[in-house]
């Protein structure tokens, strides 16, 4: 069974950089999946942030966030990370990591989620 666990600061000041990590157990992040970050802002639906592909270093980002986002992975620690620069109050959200279906099999669903971490942007 795959388990994902987010970690990072609960609060960030405006204009600073948010860094979050998702630890993966029960699977290797080298595997053929898209390791994904998603967020839910207060009172809103889920917003896709981006993913990194386990089979290589291919990334894909939400165009509206692309200029501020970097997703990377550390195979030695079996985790992947999110970096979001120049944060503002609108980046306050619950941030989730998730495993999206196999790219080679063209699976289009999420099969594992972290519990989420609330990040507040405030001075």
Language-model regions: role of each:
Residues 1-123:
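Extracellular domains of the immunoglobulin superfamily
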């Amino acid at each position: 069974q795959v388990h994902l666990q987010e970690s990072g600061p609960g609060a960030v000041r405006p204009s600073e950089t948010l860094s979050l990590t998702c630890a993966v157990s029960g699977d290797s992040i080298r595997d053929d999946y898209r390791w994904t970050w998603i967020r839910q802002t207060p009172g809103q639906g889920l917003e896709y942030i981006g993913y990194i592909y386990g089979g290589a270093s291919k990334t894909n980002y939400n165009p509206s966030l692309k200029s501020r986002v970097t997703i990377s992975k550390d195979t030695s620690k079996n985790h992947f990370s999110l970096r979001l620069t120049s944060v503002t109050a609108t980046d306050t959200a619950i941030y989730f990591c998730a495993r999206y279906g196999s790219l080679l099999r063209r699976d289009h669903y999420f099969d594992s989620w972290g519990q989420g971490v609330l990040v507040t942007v405030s001075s």
